[in-house]
Amino acid sequence: MYTDERQKELIKLTYEFLKLDAKKLTKEEAKKIVEDLREVIRFHDWRYYVLAQPVISDYEYDKLFKLLKDIEGKYPELITPDSPTQRVPSEITKVFPQVKHLTPMLSLDNSYNEADLRDFDRRVRELTGLDKVEYSVEPKFDGAGISLIYEKDLFVRGATRGDGEVGEEITNNLKVIKTIPLSAKFSQYGIDKVEIRGEVLIRKDLFKKMNEERLEEGLPLFANPRNAAAGSIRLQDPSEVAKRNLEAFVYQITYAEKDGKNLLGTVLKKHSDNIKMLHELGFKTPYPVMKVCIGIEEVIQYCEEWQRKRDAYPYEIDGMVIKVNDISLYDKLGFTSHHPRWAIAFKFKARQATTKIINVVFQVGRTGAITPVAKLEPVEIGGVIVSSVSLINEDFIREKDIRIGDTVLVERAGDVIPYVVMVIKEARTGNEKPIEFPKTCPSCGSPIVKPPGEAVYRCVNINCPAQVIERLIHFASKDAMDIKGLSEATIRKFYNLKLVRTIPDIYRLDYNLIKNIPGFGPKSVENLKNAIEESKKRPLYRLIYGLGIRYVGEVTAKTLASAVRCIDDLKNFTITDLMKLPDIGYKVASEIYNFFHNQENLKMIEELRELRVKTCHEEEEKKGKLAGLNFVFTGTLKCCSREKAKEIVESLGGNVLDTVSKKVHYLVVGEEPGSKLQKAQKLGTVKIINEEEFLKLIGGENTE
């Protein structure tokens, strides 16, 4: 669609336009640039929606779009029917059948500060004649937009957003997403046919694990949860979609019919009530965190609150959505061709930025994997200064053609590691240098190899200092033995001082020596000693996970722990025996088998036992008071974190599951419970208990 030369011209124009302010442009100046500005925006739409290869950040795109809007607002005679402000960009690739939405699936107008929100409120009040407006405020999910249609209580069609008028029909793919009910009793609300809008998401922790597994296997990483979700719902095979841990949140009813009449604004009068109804029907919705605000000041306060706590939310959100709550006002407020006038998005700080690669260094991981890391010109992304980013492996570098000196688009989503989305090749000067992989380990100088079928180079020396340090860091980490005070920096310091060389050395530390190390006082040494002693009591699965067996994550570690009485029992398992355990294939089984048939590893486990680290289940733990019972949690607990509650249940022999099903024995309900409560009530087989009853059940276990 665009030649390389034209793309370079448009990139150059992009950065020129980003410096402009519509308020300072005369009509003649605006007239000269407006068509080029439209072309620049169309170009970026094409890069984003069709190629999925943006060359600017979302924030920069929004600035360009706002510049065009402001110019057209100042000089309406410059508006053309084909202007990007008059339509929604398309993402259709014609892989799936195209279907027309019942109502247009428009974008939202964006705001970035209090002034924008107050301006929105002023316009709403002027058009409605109200002194104070009631707004609903909810998180703006950063996922893949979908539209769902239910007829006579059955889910009959699902589609992507597409160009807003026409989307791609992906019903079969959406049917495998468990948070989309295949039927819902809309008829009890007098609704025959309904169209619902939503977003497909991947929870941040599951996305992180997905990328960690792909990184370990040398597969290309997903840039962010949104890209992973958008790509997943458009896979050709629904069974593959089902493996991706997708969830769907619905956030709006756009059409509700009874006897051919639309009930919105008459029978269904308030947006917040509609979301509550969807919530009660078993859909996943923002209802638990939605707030109805009277006046714009309450709205601003709630948006600021969420900007502070955004990273604590389980899903990636990029802002808040503010809607006029009274649906009967929507006709009066109306629409532009791009967005409704009764809603606006308040966007959080940008998560993407462009910067330059200064250099590339090579780091060695605990399994010997050698990872190239780009050192960047420091850049602020989402309130955090980013100065380095993993380049994954040689294949990733070659595929994206990354070079030292390149300008790159970097994204940092929530607690997800920074990621190079793409190289801005149009910004190259000719001075960029190819990245050369080392021939030997950068830590110990040993030869490096690239095993058949793998994308990563590995150091073959298991005593390589970098590998040893990374194994120690992993062992002490929160998800493993959780040794507070034994940070990465402390481990490196202890290693350099020759205080630790192996995992058992952690339990042989000379605390009298540590007292003399700068930065360690009597109190910090005492705290470290207590934390190390406490770690000896951790559940068996944490020890297995902490040993750093390749491909063995937390879930697989739990599977192994539940299959044995003591860790030594694992040396008696053949590869075939291991493959009979849930979710363990040949590759993982081979790594486990090799680990427990390595004499050095068996010697290490024996040393840990002699140092009184728990290597067996205690009988009461294996057959604890909660043995065989499955728990699910919903809402916020006062007594402790969800992670701590999970740890207690597992220490007493129980299991904690993510979703409600007939396998679940107890649903523990905290404050602001989600849709799991309705599902449990609907099933009728799950015992629903509150926090107080849960505490009685666990019988005085320490929740701190």
Curated annotation (Swiss-Prot):
Active site: K140
UniProt xrefs under InterPro entries: BRCT_dom, BRCT_dom_sf, DisA/LigA_HHH, DNA_ligase, DNA_ligase_AS, DNA_ligase_CS, DNAligase_adenylation, DNAligase_N
GO BP term (any one): DNA replication
Pfam families on file: BRCT, DNA_ligase_aden, DNA_ligase_OB, DNA_ligase_ZBD, HHH_2, HHH_5, Nlig-Ia
Signal peptide per UniProt: none
Classification via HAMAP family: DNA_ligase_A (MF_01588)
Family: Belongs to the NAD-dependent DNA ligase family. LigA subfamily.
Protein name: DNA ligase
Organism from which the protein derives: Sulfurihydrogenibium sp. (strain YO3AOP1)
Gene this protein is translated from: ligA
